Design a protein with these regions (language model features):
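N-terminal transmembrane-helix/juxtamembrane module of multi-pass inner/ER membrane proteins
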Residues: 1-50, 88-115, 201-210, 236, ...
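Multi-pass membrane proteins that catalyze or facilitate reactions on polyprenyl-/lipid-phosphate substrates
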Residues: 2-4, 11-16, 70, 74, ...
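Membrane-helix interfacial "entry" motifs
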Residues: 28-36, 65, 69, 73, ...
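Interfacial segments of alpha-helical transmembrane regions
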Residues: 56-87
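Membrane-helix interface segments
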Residues: 65-72, 101, 139-145
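Transmembrane alpha-helical segments of multi-pass membrane transport proteins and ion-pumping complexes
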Residues: 81, 85-89, 93, 176-184
């Protein structure tokens, strides 16, 4: 299939290739241990970090008053990543862009074995940004932390020489579009599902024990508060005024 994206090296002034070479060139001057660390981070480290943030988000969502809704939002993160990866399959075949080091052998490649795979869009970048955007809708602090890892992921993919900058940006855009555009449909399915799970044997996956206990105490306290309010209202009722006759008798 003909390549739809122009060859990134077609012109010496191509900013796509220029930025890639600038970042990848750092690897040539870096010590071997740093190259190995960045390569591991680019392939696995960022994903482990995002998984840890997702776990923290899930634990926090279970303790919220709207736990089923919050947990549904967290659950949408990995599902959105899966949808993004499926959407990328036809996109990558349509664009048919080879890895940058295939057409530019002068690049310093730190992650071998990707010669037969396509470059656009970056799967790792799409996965990272998909998690970040989905978590941001549930917890802004954790979403921003995941977003920082997603940006670091993009830098690492350039550092190891396996993607062009536009591959990374394409991954970011694809994941963001999937998360935001499909979120209403996903939540329409996931929220009722999480509510149903919260009423069954899998309730601990959706609602933490402390949150469940607090909710139960609030439900028990509400009728008591209403009864107490009614009694207080009766106690505050005005006393009947004494007649003038009693005053004269005094």
């Amino acid at each position: 299939m003909p390549t739809l994206l122009a060859d990134a090296g077609a012109g010496s002034g191509d900013p796509d290739l220029g930025l890639l070479k600038a970042v990848n060139g750092l690897a040539a001057d870096a010590p071997g241990w740093l190259d190995s660390l960045v390569a591991w981070t680019a392939e696995y480290g960022i994903l482990f970090g995002l998984a840890a943030i997702g776990l923290v988000a899930w634990l926090g969502a279970r303790r919220r008053p709207d736990a089923p809704v919050a947990v549904a939002g967290v659950l949408w993160a990995p599902l959105a990543v899966a949808v993004s990866e499926l959407a990328n399959l036809p996109i990558s075949q349509l664009v048919d862009r080879p890895r940058p080091f295939v057409t530019h052998p002068e690049l310093d490649v730190l992650v071998p074995g990707k010669e037969d795979t396509l470059s656009f869009v970056s799967d790792h970048s799409a996965m990272s940004m998909g998690v970040a955007v989905a978590l941001f809708l549930v917890n802004r602090r954790l979403g921003l932390a995941a977003g920082a890892l997603a940006l670091l992921q993009g830098f690492c993919r350039l550092f190891v020489g396996v993607h062009y900058p536009t591959d990374v940006l394409g991954g970011y855009a694809l994941a963001t579009a999937v998360v935001l555009l499909l979120a209403p449909l996903a939540m329409a399915v996931l929220v009722p599902l999480c509510h149903a799970l919260s009423r069954g044997a899998l309730r601990p996956l959706v609602v933490a024990r402390a949150a469940a206990a607090d909710s139960g105490r609030r439900r028990q306290a509400a009728p008591a508060a209403r009864r107490s309010g009614r009694r207080a209202g009766r106690d505050r009722s005005p006393e009947p005024e004494r007649g003038s006759g009693s005053d004269l008798a005094a």
